[in-house]
Amino acid sequence: MIYQERNGNAVAVHQGENKMDIADLDFSHRMDMELSKHSFPYFFQNVLGMMYPKYMEEWLESMETTDRTVIICSRDHGKSVFMHSWVVWNLVFQEPPFQMLYISSNQKQTMVHMREIDRYFNLPQLKHLRPSRGWAIGNIALTNGNSILERSVGSQIRGLHPQEIIIDDPL
């Protein structure tokens, strides 16, 4: 079976005897989103399609049980991917208005992170949260009323009142 995009929806194109229609696919997406509401690991694995190793379980437990979490780990363990996914999950499922702030070492690096976060909203299950007029990469505001702003280390953050701040690669 091949999936194609038509009018913003993923459509199953039938091949052979295995048939699936749009309603089945929509139902599957709705179920994935419903199960994701209360489970970041489910969202990470089943909606975003990522592997969820044991050490990420420890990161999540720390984030859910403390007010401040620092994750120190060598390169290529998925810290940024984990945090981007965490941001997306919160933006999708937190009660609005929920504002996040993403801070990195410099403007260029912060924008790299924000572009990665932006990419997730091209997934069929999340596309409806992207406003028709679009958004600025540095100020992502979803149709559900939640948003994320970017800042670099040393930039002005006075006056902002985000519910969550992510500091990724500050040095």
Question: For each of these PLM feature ranges, what is it?
Answer:
Residues 2-171:
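Phosphate/NTP-binding elements of NTP-utilizing enzymes
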